[in-house]
Amino acid sequence: VPQAKSNKLQVRLVDGKGNVCGETSLTVSSRQWKTYKAVITAKATADTHLEIIPQSVGELNLDMISLFPQNTFKGRKNGLRKDLAQVLADIHPRFIRFPGGCVAHGDGLKNIYQWKNTVGPLEARKAQRNLWGYHQSMGLGYFEYFQFCEDIGAEPLPVLAAGVPCQNSACHGDLRGGQQGGIPMSEMGAYIQDILDLIEWANGDAKKTKWGKVRAEAGHPKPFNLKYIGIGNEDLITDIFEERFTMIFNAIKEKYPEMIVVGTVGPFNEGTDYVEGWKLADKLGIPMVDEHYYQTP
């Protein structure tokens, strides 16, 4: 706060007619990054927007602004919106796939979903855009996902890129073709370790393992008992894909032989990728594959 010892912010909810439906204030006094929290109690039910108004002269840097309900599903900290989560719970799904789709393998190598950026303090998580063109705050990260699965009795099925990004990377508008590419072989060891670290984070002992301790510090000392892990999403079954998928698959089976790896057989339930995907599955002995059907029942 360069020009003031402290700076008060008015924080309020305002409807389309300019009526204030709830407000509070925050006093910012630190010159360092710091988390500030306050509670707004709504005085009406309305379609509103959030306003943050400085009350003194100065300069402020704001980051990770979040308006979040106190009453979450199962009362979980940073949990899911209660009504939407209940809809999912009422379906009684046997598993939940996350983050799923092209979000998992991303728009190019630098956009591949990194699970480690989604755990830990909310304000420290690394946000990024996704292939669909919108922003991910990572507020719903792997911890919240695993916790939700546990709360509704569903098996978690995390999906990680198979060392390649989406083949539609860099496609815009009606342009098609894209590029698949692949993580450089010199970096595959580190990428595979990230995947193994996820399994340790989910299932590792809270006192004996590095990532099990991270999970415990987030509020879940007991393992999540992860049984399934998806590798790849609707990928073209190319030499680039096969080489990297095989490396990942073998590494998982060596360290965690009990883990059920779910493979991919291309974006459709027919065609070259489907056929080649099944050939690879048979060759490696992949226990389960994820077929995708874009058809009406």
Report residues per predicted region:
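A conserved hydrophobic secondary-structure block that centers on an alpha-helix together
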Residues: 74, 146, 151-188, 198, ...
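Extended acidic/polar, glycine-enriched regions
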Residues: 1-90
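Short, well-ordered coil/turn segments that N-cap beta-strands
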Residues: 45-48, 57, 92-94, 152-156, ...
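Active-site-adjacent substrate/metal-binding segments within catalytic domains
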Residues: 10-12, 60-161, 210
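Active-site neighborhood of glycoside hydrolase catalytic domains
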Residues: 190-197, 201-297
